[in-house]
């Protein structure tokens, strides 16, 4: 620590004020902000998850993280809060200063004056003033019907309590340490005050909701809380369950203002939202890579040179992550072989939803990352008014309660979330559409009778609904500011409103990523089924060709024997699901193409075709009859083997870096291939994945997909 000289408010005498060397070198904080953006986004998310899983959150005022807020917000969780004992002296000093200054007759806002536009009023009854502050701010509406809920979720309340305590620990607010200990006891005993969902403009802080925390601490008769088992508690019952032996607090001058005049509700909820948004951003990157796998895409879109020439770090990282997933992928090796067959008859490039996914996701990741840093600064800030500067013996009147960083960050995050959802919808729409999905069945149907199986059709409709609502939520909140409180609060951040809307948005994005993930797993299984069915068809066509086409009537070698190689090429080229529900149908492409091969050979048979013994045309009927007798049974047997887990060709996904995610959905959650022949609906499987996602169980398999990534693109050779 270095020291700089500062003049006391009365002038004349100078005092030494401790300032970190880093502050002197970076007085505007831009350097620190830039330093915080170093390293990869993925590493940052991993660190966030690590902090989320720590058993204890040690609060000291300046090191609280998004992951820690998310951990404490978990209702019924086991993570505990501990207050840094080193903060006690600073907190006490500011509290003592308020009492001493009032005794000396110092005129301070919110201590001897009225509030806001009526701060011209004066009183010497500081305790009564704080009591009245809490009373008039208890202006929220809860309602008492089951159809509507106007109560802030417990998770958001817990986040707000944690963030507010963190702010007050820094010793600039004039509040007793014992009050902070009481809030901590409530947190550690899973007791949450009931806060109204609406009623704050997050400037002057989140006055209305925070007043209900103060109301519980002071034992207001209208105060309620929710206990560890979800039971409703009075203030008295809440104190008893939390083991707070001091009884209700009689607020001293400034303490009511210290409790309510801050941005903790908006920034607390923003922290929860950003934890989820960061995980969803990584999931979107990985899902885009798996989408490329099941779509038989071309991995060229991840080539590092393309993205290095664009310069944007979010894009470069998104591409590098996808490149890592696709590097060595068994699907990509197979896709390359497929693309090499008849290349001039296929699109040269994949569609935008696949090919430009790094360019699309990159800016969204940058926005979410920037918002994360902004909110992390906010939850470690001192954001009430006035600020008590004991070192300079003065109360500083300012506006740190203005939650603009929250409103702006949440608006930006919500826009990014909407863009991620739009990409997922575009990818999902391609996945279920047999015009675009490179051979997968329409609607990802898996039954032998597609006329009675419509697969993910309902899911696609639901995805359109989710995406539409998400795009609507992308509209900004901060452009709807209204002048409030007798035009004193004439500009205000709407931070909590924006956080709430972003919470809604991330919840909808989770619905979309859930649906997309289950759809991708369905596609993985269909590719597995496709391979086994194709091999069965190849084997059967080969056997029938050998039996029917090799020899003539008298056992002599027949010219038609040369058809077999070209017949097998047809099977390789033809998309299995275009014919496999009725493989020998004359209206389906397989039989048409096979017949065409034999016809072409017959036309090139020359003079020998005129001889009935050597005529290839004469073999067409026998070949088709034999195939009709054998192929449907073999296909049915192949489906049965696949269904009971004895398919001869293993699932390629097991050879891919994306396997941990698939394994989690299929094995750990117990979801199955969806078919019209089964009773299970898509929504039932979606619920399993969505619930696991909301419980944070998807994080480990997601990170397992990337555990070998070294944080850099594959070198350009």
Swiss-Prot record:
Molecular function via GO: phenylalanine ammonia-lyase activity
Main location: cytoplasm
Cellular component terms per the entry's GO annotation: cytoplasm
Gene3D superfamilies tied to this protein: Fumarase/aspartase (Central domain), Fumarase/aspartase (N-terminal domain), Phenylalanine ammonia-lyase 1, domain 3
Location of this chain's protein in the cell: Cytoplasm
Gene Ontology annotations of biological process type: cinnamic acid biosynthetic process; L-phenylalanine catabolic process; phenylpropanoid biosynthetic process; response to oxidative stress
Enzyme Commission no: 4.3.1.24
Listed Pfam families: Lyase_aromatic (PF00221)
Activity at various pH: Optimum pH is 8.4-8.9.
UniProt entry keywords in alphabetical sequence: Cytoplasm, Lyase, Phenylalanine catabolism, Phenylpropanoid metabolism
Pathway noted in the entry: Phenylpropanoid metabolism; trans-cinnamate biosynthesis; trans-cinnamate from L-phenylalanine: step 1/1
Annotated binding of (E)-cinnamate, by residue: 261, 349, 355, 385, 457, 485, 488
2,3-didehydroalanine (Ser) PTM positions: 204
Top-level taxonomic group: Eukaryota
Reported temperature dependence: Optimum temperature is 48 degrees Celsius.
Keyword Lyase assigned: yes
Active site: 109 (proton donor/acceptor)
Catalytic activity reported: L-phenylalanine = (E)-cinnamate + NH4(+)
Post-translational modification: Contains an active site 4-methylidene-imidazol-5-one (MIO), which is formed autocatalytically by cyclization and dehydration of residues Ala-Ser-Gly.
InterPro entries named in the record: Aromatic_Lyase, Fumarase/histidase_N, L-Aspartase-like, Phe/His_NH3-lyase_AS, Phe_NH3-lyase, Phe_NH3-lyase_shielding_dom_sf
Function: This is a key enzyme of plant metabolism catalyzing the first reaction in the biosynthesis from L-phenylalanine of a wide variety of natural products based on the phenylpropane skeleton.
Oligomeric form and interacting partners: Homotetramer.
Family of this protein: Belongs to the PAL/histidase family.
Listed name of the protein: Phenylalanine ammonia-lyase 2
Taxonomic lineage: Eukaryota, Viridiplantae, Streptophyta, Embryophyta, Tracheophyta
């Amino acid at each position: 620590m270095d020291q700089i000289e500062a003049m006391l408010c009365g002038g004349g005498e100078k005092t030494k004020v401790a300032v970190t060397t880093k502050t002197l070198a970076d007085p505007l904080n831009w350097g620190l902000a830039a330093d915080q953006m170093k390293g990869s986004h993925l590493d940052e998310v991993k660190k966030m998850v690590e902090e989320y899983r720590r058993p204890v959150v040690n609060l000291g005022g300046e090191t609280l993280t998004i992951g820690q807020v998310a951990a404490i917000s978990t209702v019924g969780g086991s993570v505990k809060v501990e207050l840094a004992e080193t903060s006690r002296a600073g907190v006490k000093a500011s509290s003592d200063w308020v009492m001493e200054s009032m005794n000396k007759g110092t005129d301070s806002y919110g201590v001897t004056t009225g509030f806001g536009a009526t701060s011209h009023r004066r009183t010497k009854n500081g305790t009564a003033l704080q009591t009245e502050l809490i009373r008039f701010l208890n202006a929220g509406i809860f309602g008492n019907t089951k159809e509507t809920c106007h109560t802030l979720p417990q998770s958001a309340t817990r986040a707000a309590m944690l963030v507010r305590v963190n702010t007050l620990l820094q010793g600039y607010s004039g509040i007793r340490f014992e009050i902070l200990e009481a809030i901590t006891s409530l947190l550690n005993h899973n007791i949450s005050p009931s806060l109204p969902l609406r009623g704050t403009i997050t400037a002057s802080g989140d006055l209305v909701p925070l007043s209900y925390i103060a109301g519980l601490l002071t034992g207001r008769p209208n105060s309620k809380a929710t206990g560890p088992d979800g039971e409703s508690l009075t203030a008295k019952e809440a104190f008893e369950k939390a083991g707070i032996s001091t009884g209700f607090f009689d607020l001293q001058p400034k303490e009511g203002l210290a409790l309510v005049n801050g941005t903790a509700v908006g920034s607390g909820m923003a922290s929860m939202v950003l934890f989820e948004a960061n995980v969803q951003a990584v999931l979107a990157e990985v899902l885009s890579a798996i989408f490329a796998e099941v779509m038989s895409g071309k991995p060229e879109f991840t080539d590092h040179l393309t993205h290095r020439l664009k310069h944007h770090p979010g894009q470069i990282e998104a591409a590098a992550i996808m490149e890592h997933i696709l590097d060595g992928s068994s699907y990509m090796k197979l896709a390359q072989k497929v693309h090499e067959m008849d290349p001039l008859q296929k699109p040269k490039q994949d569609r935008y939803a696949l090919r430009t996914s790094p360019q699309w996701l990159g800016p969204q990741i940058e926005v979410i990352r920037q918002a994360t840093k902004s909110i992390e600064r906010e939850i470690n800030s001192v954001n009430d008014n006035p600020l008590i500067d004991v070192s300079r013996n003065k109360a500083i009147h300012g506006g740190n309660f203005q939650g603009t960083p929250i409103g702006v960050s949440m608006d930006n995050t919500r826009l990014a979330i909407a863009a991620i959802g739009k990409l997922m919808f575009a990818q999902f729409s391609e996945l279920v559409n047999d015009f675009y999905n490179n051979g997968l069945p329409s609607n990802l149907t898996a039954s032998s009778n597609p006329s009675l199986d419509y697969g993910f059709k309902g899911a696609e409709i639901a995805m359109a609904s989710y995406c539409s609502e998400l795009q609507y939520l992308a509209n900004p909140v901060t452009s709807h500011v209204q002048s409030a409180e007798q035009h004193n609060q004439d500009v205000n951040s709407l931070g909590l409103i924006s956080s709430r809307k972003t919470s809604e948005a991330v919840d909808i994005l989770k619905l979309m990523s859930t649906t997309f993930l289950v759809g991708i797993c369905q596609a993985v299984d269909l590719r597995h089924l496709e391979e086994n069915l194709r091999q069965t068809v190849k084997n059967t066509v080969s056997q029938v060709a050998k039996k029917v086409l090799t020899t003539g009537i008298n056992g002599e070698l027949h010219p038609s024997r040369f058809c077999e190689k070209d017949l097998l090429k047809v099977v390789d080229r033809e998309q299995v699901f275009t014919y496999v529900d009725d493989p020998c149908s004359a209206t389906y492409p397989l039989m048409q193409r096979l017949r065409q091969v034999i016809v072409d050979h017959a036309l090139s048979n020359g003079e020998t075709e005129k001889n009935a013994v050597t005529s290839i045309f004469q073999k067409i009927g026998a070949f088709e009859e034999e195939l009709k007798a054998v192929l449907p049974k073999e296909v049915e047997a192949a489906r049965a083997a696949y269904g009971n887990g004895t398919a001869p060709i293993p699932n390629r996904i097991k050879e891919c870096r994306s396997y941990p995610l698939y394994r989690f959905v299929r094995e750990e959650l117990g979801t199955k291939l969806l078919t019209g022949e089964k009773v299970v609906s898509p929504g039932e499987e979606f619920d399993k994945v969505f619930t696991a996602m909301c419980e944070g169980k998807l994080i480990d398999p997601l990170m397992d997909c990337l555990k070998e990534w070294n944080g850099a693109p594959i070198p350009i050779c």
